[in-house]
């Protein structure tokens, strides 16, 4: 239940416990693309979409709003990339791979079963090797989006994880950078560019406001 703080904390504790045990010898095929490369790629895509929209003679409402907002969001995206590059990311990633850290890959409320006595995690189809902060970030973001980015809720989730699996300074910085990147904005722009560029739903228009 995403409205129950008790269930949310149990889910985070279960993730931390899972992360302590999910370690295997690295198989190169399952190593995820480095986050630095991912941000570089996504930022190129944002610039490419901006160029495409600028060159259109007739622009719909979505495209006009996109052009109004892209400078701000692209700045945040490039700043997150710069911060990641200047952080201890490479060292953190190397240590994660050396210890064989495994991520669930899709840790959200749909894949956590809150039982009477225990908590079960299901659907490991998207598992891979990476910094395990990825899982924590994905889960926290999904929950916080549903609660209007409640800072106290975010703090409690972090504490619940930290109590089970202590977070170091590099992991906390990595988590901060992930939250700083405008992921939802990139997804919206990428969806527009990859699908019909002529028809835009009202829902997507609202997301740009």
Residue ranges: model-predicted function:
Residues 1-31:
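ATP-binding pocket architecture of kinase catalytic cores
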Residues 133-166, 179-198:
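Active-site activation/catalytic loop segments of kinase-like enzymes and analogous catalytic loops
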Residues 29-102, 207:
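ATP-dependent phospho-/nucleotidyl transfer catalytic cores
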Residues 16-19, 58, 73, 94, ...:
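Gram-positive cell-envelope targeting signals
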Residues 55-60, 191-209:
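Helical subdomain adjoining the active site within ATP-dependent kinase catalytic cores
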Residues 83-134:
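Active-site acidic catalytic loop and adjacent metal/ATP-binding pocket
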Residues 167-171:
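Helix N-cap / loop-to-helix initiation motif
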């Amino acid at each position: 239940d995403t409205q129950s703080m008790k269930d949310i904390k149990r889910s985070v504790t279960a993730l931390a416990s899972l992360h302590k045990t999910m370690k295997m010898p690295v198989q190169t095929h399952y190593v995820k693309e480095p986050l630095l490369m991912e941000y570089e790629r996504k930022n190129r895509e944002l610039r490419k979409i901006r160029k495409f929209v600028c060159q259109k003679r007739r622009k719909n409402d979505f495209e006009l709003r996109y052009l109004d907002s892209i400078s701000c969001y692209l700045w945040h995206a490039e700043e997150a990339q710069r911060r990641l590059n200047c952080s201890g990311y490479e060292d953190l990633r190397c240590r994660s791979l050396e210890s064989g850290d495994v991520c669930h890959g899709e840790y959200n409320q749909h894949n956590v079963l809150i039982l009477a006595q225990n908590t079960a995690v299901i659907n490991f189809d998207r598992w891979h090797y990476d910094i395990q902060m990825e899982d924590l970030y994905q889960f926290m973001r999904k929950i916080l989006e549903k609660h209007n980015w409640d800072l106290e809720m975010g703090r409690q989730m972090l504490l619940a994880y930290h109590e089970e699996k202590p977070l170091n300074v590099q992991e906390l910085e990595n988590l901060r950078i992930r939250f700083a990147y405008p992921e939802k904005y990139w997804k919206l722009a990428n969806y527009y560019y990859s699908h019909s560029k002529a028809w835009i739903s009202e829902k997507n228009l609202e997301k740009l406001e």
